[in-house]
Amino acid sequence: MAYSYTEKKRIRKDFSKLPDVMDVPYLLAIQLDSYREFLQAGATKDQFRDVGLHAAFKSVFPIISYSGNAALEYVGYRLGEPAFDVKECVLRGVTFAVPLRVKVRLIIFDKESSNKAIKDIKEQEVYMGEIPLMTENGTFVINGTERVIVSQLHRSPGVFFDHDRGKTHSSGKLLYSARIIPYRGSWLDFEFDPKDCVFVRIDRRRKLPASVLLRALGYTTEEVLDAFYTTNVFHVKGEGLSLELVPQRLRGEVAVLDIQDDKGKVIVEQGRRITARHINQLEKAGIKELDVPLDYVLGRTTAKAIVHPATGEILAECNTELSTEILAKIAKAGVVRIETLYTNDIDCGPFVSDTLKIDSTSNQLEALVEIYRMMRPGEPPTKDAAETLFNNLFFSPERYDLSAVGRMKFNRRIGRTEIEGSGVLCKEDIVAVLKTLVDIRNGKGIVDDIDHLGNRRVRCVGEMAENQFRVGLVRVERAVKERLSMAESEGLMPQDLINAKPVAAAVKEFFGSSQLSQFMDQNNPLSEITHKRRVSALGPGGLTRERAGFEVRDVHPTHYGRVCPIETPEGPNIGLINSLAAYARTNQYGFLESPYRVVKEGVVTDDIVFLSAIEEADHVIAQASATMNEQKVLIDELVAVRHLNEFTVKAPEDVTLMDVSPKQVVSVAASLIPFLEHDDANRALMGSNMQRQAVPTLRADKPLVGTGMERNVARDSGVCVVARRGGVIDSVDASRIVVRVADDEVETGEAGVDIYNLTKYTRSNQNTCINQRPLVSKGDRVQRSDIMADGPSTDMGELALGQNMRIAFMAWNGFNFEDSICLSERVVQEDRFTTIHIQELTCVARDTKLGPEEITADIPNVGEAALNKLDEAGIVYVGAEVGAGDILVGKVTPKGETQLTPEEKLLRAIFGEKASDVKDTSLRVPTGTKGTVIDVQVFTRDGVERDARALSIEKSQLDEIRKDLNEEFRIVEGATFERLRSALVGHKAEGGAGLKKGQDITDEVLDGLEHGQWFKLRMAEDALNEQLEKAQAYIVDRRRLLDDKFEDKKRKLQQGDDLAPGVLKIVKVYLAIRRRIQPGDKMAGRHGNKGVVSVIMPVEDMPHDANGTPVDVVLNPLGVPSRMNVGQILETHLGLAAKGLGEKINRMVEEQRKVAELRTFLDEIYNQIGGRNEDLDSFSDQEILDLAKNLRGGVPMATPVFDGAKESEIKAMLKLADLPESGQMQLTDGRTGNKFERPVTVGYMYMLKLNHLVDDKMHARSTGSYSLVTQQPLGGKAQFGGQRFGEMEVWALEAYGAAYTLQEMLTVKSDDVNGRTKMYKNIVDGDHRMEPGMPESFNVLIKEIRSLGIDIDLETE
């Protein structure tokens, strides 16, 4: 197998048993593919597919004027180039977007001609605002901050059948309902009431009988009954009737007479209930008619109106119950045929017939009026208005759209075969839904499960952006229609008609402030990836936290392989926000799909199919771990399978599909937890959530025990530098890597150079530090997609969120009581958990009423010492160490003249104090912060003179750019001359460049010439002369191109910045703050085992083993059994083995053993004990040595979820490392020197430092701001608030009888306004007395009681 550049340097021992049938797909595909589809950038007019922007335009255009004399048609669109690249946008605080230009065509028709002849056509490109672009990592830069648009899981459009679970009516009767949900437009609900009539609601308004809707659609009573019922036909014969017999319909009835066959044999006796056996006999006997008495039809309902044969008089209306009077009339009139509805109580209820009976309307117009009154109460209905309203509700493509998904779901649910059709409803659709609903009420068919993933679909970025864009376009459409009527008379062009503001505003609003457009979680690479793969049920058109019940939040069988059952937040959002499973993707309709291997007759093939939850329902799906032999035949007698959403067992030949991987069930974060299968789900949930909060440490350290997913996450997250093309490293330093591209990957006519600028010490959204470090050296060969530089929290191209710590599980002096963590001082000394945080502090100089603010080093009443870190422009130097209260940017603000006291006048007269008209508003370092200035940015408004600092920053940026371009040119030039050299050497010259005619060209000759003189050579062969000319032209061309590029960048840098109105200058100062681990910081493992550091002990006091090696962390063993996360113990044991093997390799390297010995030992580790075999024979001796050197800190292991290391393999590894197989050892107490009573579990666990640092939470207040009404101090660190002394704390002081302390708490320390000012003055004067007064909140209480109309006063005597 082929190893990548970084894999060769450090191979992870893989314990998985199952082969990789399929690689984990690109993890950000869901975001990138969706937005690419939306933009269709680079498509020509004929290549546009009917999705995204194109579809939005097509749905709104053509716009036709009210008069119909002019129309505006859409032709196509194109996207421009972004003004700034991503880094510049972040720096300047602008949106990374491209201009959208739409080509439209204005057509003016000739009013005079009858067939709309075209009079004039104008075509023009119109600017339609900016469309934000997605960066290559799936984020958007909006106003300079990186944001992510989270995908939404919402109810798919279509038709759904449900019941109320017996909750509506006290009898517990199930009331069935149907709901047609369009993609946009009015909802249509049908529902049964407790009396079994069917009602309809439109948009959840007042309900009407369902027959009103059917009448409004133009159906008559007879047509309705005809559609829903079959009829019984009776023929009148003398005194009795004869029924046209359909034997099945008699089932369950009691025979009124003996039923006999032709031969007179009694099949059913009178008074007997007719059973299935009787029906079989009747069918065999072939009886066609059955004589029944006249009263047999009493109470039955007529299916058609009964008409007097002679006069045509209606004897009984359609849908009337037959009574004795009506029967008498019928007999008298001589009617020969009566049709009644066939209903029964078992499977054919009279629901629609009953509904028609309670319906007050009798024709289409009345029904339309009734619907109009319900939709628009209080408005007088007219025929036209009622018809228009009804047609617009469900039958107008502008107002109603089922969408392709909705139509597909709708047709499938009501049993049609075709999946395409109109986006609006038709009569037949509504009748079909009603029929299905009645069938379900009759006991045929089942209701839908709305939490099934076949009924919920994912809306991704592209689709949501398209919807917003359409909303904007519809707003534009109204305005354009108004103006189109004037277009002809005033000779307007398309751009005069279209105002792009509403479109731009709609898009901006969506990206800037939609609930699903979120500030990206950028703590570490994992949190970025997880945020982009998140699927939320909240948001516009989705659920709300308060209304979502248990069912929606619960894990559903269809989540398997689509949505992770583990990773979801704790708290009010649990189950509403989910994460995509590792292999899941969406299909063209937005339903989540999971991959499966095809199984044919018990043989597993390598064909892979992606199926949605609907498609997989009928399949029998085996687990990925089902046992197979060499020929891939399933060999178990019974295989554990999933079928019809149930877990069961089947014979191998029944199996049709098989999972592709055991980790396809869980999300990326959960698949990073080793031994996940041994952890309780609740703790695994915490584990996967806490990995996202890990702060990148100063030196990343790969996990000794991983799962093999670390490499995928690091590569796909975009924090590492990945080679775009293969080649040789030409030069590398801390900030850039230059690759000379391999010849076979160079495209003709372009420079074979790739320059990768590394990100150095940049601030992330969470104030953590983003920094990239090169892994490659000059001269190394890299292949495409090799990792060349590590980013934050990555180590040699693998995700590394924490540090491997030597831990012991033991209770120790109560230092680790209740999940506390005891650390060794060595951890702090070695900077294991030291993190760098970067804070951005901003100083804004504005134009005020009294004059402009000024950024300057000349600040009134500030000593020299405070200014020693500022330059002459008043801005702090880069590299300055600053502490709380230090000035970073000096700024003065003009203040109004104040009345001076006589003393001040005297002082000013003596000292000539001039600085009284400005006040000091400098930017200072906030309290509790100490750090180093690492960068300063100055932004100046156009037209304002730039200060020296801004110019020097600009110059250094230009130098950087110039250096880049020169480097590129140097390599291009070098490569070109190398190619020329190989072409020229060995040929004869004709002269030129000081050479004689016929002189042979050798390397020496060429080395003696300057590069510029090579082009003066005249060669004997014309082909070579042509090559020289081409090379010269190419080099000149490249130089010109690079110069143009430089000028363009220079222009961008030198133009003024686009600042908010009234802002003259902005200075941003970046502080790097170093945080060591300290008591109060929160730490965690990967198994949900979290705790707070309680104490940091000296190294010599820590427990140590027989070799004197002290442990780094002491954890409480009581934290394991009750929480059931045993995975951490297995990780500890395997970590010990990994470290032990590393130490063994280290000894071999130090003793300079032969490579063959190393190779043998490595083979024992990788190929003798369980899991996958590694191809060590393909490594050269040097590569084996490099590998061994990198393994000295420990041999990294991978134990993939649900397919990891077994206990026997862990023991074998410990044995190979010469360690006790129990994983326990005898420890000695460092303080007393005594051995502990029993052996202790010691090993290596991967610990994370979470972004809940005590430094950010520490807070103290003396005086500060107060709440307006109650006059009590505000709460919280952000408001510089106080600590609330609550009701229970008051009880505590009351219990101790501490009356004065309590009085102080409730008055002068809180809301006694006069008391606290007096107290402050007293303390300043050194007098520590207090005079408590009336608390302000008591006055508020009195005012509230008075507002209730009670006169209340406080008697003070």
Curated annotation (Swiss-Prot):
Pfam families: RNA_pol_Rpb2_1 (PF04563), RNA_pol_Rpb2_2 (PF04561), RNA_pol_Rpb2_3 (PF04565), RNA_pol_Rpb2_45 (PF10385), RNA_pol_Rpb2_6 (PF00562), RNA_pol_Rpb2_7 (PF04560). It catalyses: RNA(n) + a ribonucleoside 5'-triphosphate = RNA(n+1) + diphosphate. It comes from the Bacteria. Keywords: DNA-directed RNA polymerase, Nucleotidyltransferase, Transcription, Transferase. GO terms for cellular component: DNA-directed RNA polymerase complex. InterPro entries: DNA-dir_RNA_pol_bsu_ext_1_sf, DNA-dir_RNA_pol_bsu_external_1, DNA-dir_RNA_pol_su2, DNA-dir_RNAP_su2_dom, DNA-dir_RNAP_su2_hyb_sf, RNA_pol_bsu_bac, RNA_pol_bsu_CS, RNA_pol_bsu_protrusion. GO terms for biological process: DNA-templated transcription. This is DNA-directed RNA polymerase subunit beta. It comes from Pseudomonas fluorescens (strain Pf0-1). The gene is rpoB.
